[in-house]
Structures are given as C-alpha cells and as structure tokens.
Amino acid sequence: MSNQSFRLVLGIAAIGFASISAHDAFGAPPTVPFGVEFKGCVESIGVALAPTENVVALTPPGFIPVGIGTPTSPIVVRTADCAGISVDGGKSKPGSVVQIGAVIVPPAFSGEDIDNYTFWYYTSDERLAHRLRKAGVSAQHVETIDYVLEPGMSGVPNHLAVVVPRPGDPRFAVAGTVASSVAPSGAFRAAWWQKTAAGNVRMDTTVPVIAIGAADLTLATRPDNALGALIGATTLGFPILQQFNVFVGAHMDVFVAP
C-alpha cells in the first residue's frame, strides 16, 4: 500500500505502578516537553470498531470520536518493539510500547496523519513510563511485555504474538500473522493525546521513512476488564485497517498542547 493510500484509508476512518521519586535513579528533569528516539522498530497497527457509547464514555469533553452520531467508532490498537528507545538523550535500550485509543477529531490540528485519544499506554521502558507519568499521562510500566515475532522473509507471513501481562491493566493479547515489506512508503506522523491536570498532553511521533506490510491479527481479552467492556466482547478483529510496519527510526515529542 502506498503512503498516499495509507493516508486515504486513515482519512476515511478519520482515523503504552509504583511511583518513582523525582530524585531517584532518573534524576529530576523538567516534566515537559521532552523527546524520545526509537530505533530499529517493528510495529503492528489495527483499527477496529467499538460501540460509540462505550468509546464516548472513555473520551473526555473536547475530544470528538470520529464515529459520533453512529453506532460504532474506530479504535486503534498499536504494538511496537524497538532495538533502542532513548528518552531525552539517555542511554538507548531495547523496549516495547503498546497503545489503545480512539480515533478522534482533535482540539487542534497541526498536519498529522492521524489523531488518537489514549485510553491505555504500556511500555517495558521504565524511564519512558516514568517521564510520561511525570507529564500526567497514565502510562504503565510493564517490564515483561511479551513481543514474539517469528523470523521470516520479507513478504512471507510469519507469526506475531504480543501479550500485556500483569501489572498491565487491562491485560490482553494480540496475535496472528504478519508480512513485512521492504518498500518505503514515505513519512508518517501520528498524535496521541491525553487530558491531564496540566492540560492536553500530546505525544507526536514522526517516522521519516516507513515500510508498510500486511497483517491478520486478533485481540483477546477478558470480559470483566475495562477493555472487554469497551469492545463488548472477548475478542476483536480489525476490519478497518491492519498493518505490520518496519522503520529504522522515529522521534516522539511530548508536550502540553497550547
């Protein structure tokens, strides 16, 4: 799929806890803004539909789910695993990020390809979780996110399984087949938002060059947790959009929107 087609699909859909002292091992840097570098990453993207009333219940005023006025609204499930994550120029370490949120019409638009409101954010990178929480984002540090990608050739389906265990809440898994691509599709920019006591925090990620592949994935969760309540089921497919992407590097800016 070309980058132009990808943007079109997203347009049609109008589509990561113990607290850590500011003087612990991470020091006491400014809360926001700050930057994050991601290196050598694979990423799955799934866009599904959930009952609009359930999506609205998790979305604060000022953020408009794109399905408002219709029975269902698109939600995004993103998983990423990187060879290196570096927060504010710190040491780069391997890590994973998992995000779930609603595709929204944002309070302010600045040229991004997609805007999402963050329901849940999980990361295995302790420093990233710490900095996001300092910024007011409800990021969860889940040290043992299981991200298993079977080795495979480009364009040939292979198995992907991502499991968010305790202390992640809600817990869930995403699994299925994916096929990577080596064909670059240009740049992509996504903004994930969350309302905090300090204001609306944006997590803007720019990927200069991304290779967009295919995926056939299913999410599984428990009926008695918040995710099961959101989707109204224990399993969820992704009929709107599924992708498995590869990129060499990306940069995320975290800041309070003016």
Describe each model-derived feature in a short phrase.
Residues 26-86, 217-236, 240-243, 251-258:
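N-terminal domain-onset segments
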Residues 1-10:
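Bacterial N-terminal signal peptides that target proteins for export
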Residues 3, 17-19, 122:
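Intrinsically disordered, low-complexity segments
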Residues 135-258:
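Interaction-surface and assembly-scaffold signal
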Residues 82-167:
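Aromatic- and glycine-enriched beta-alpha-beta binding-site module
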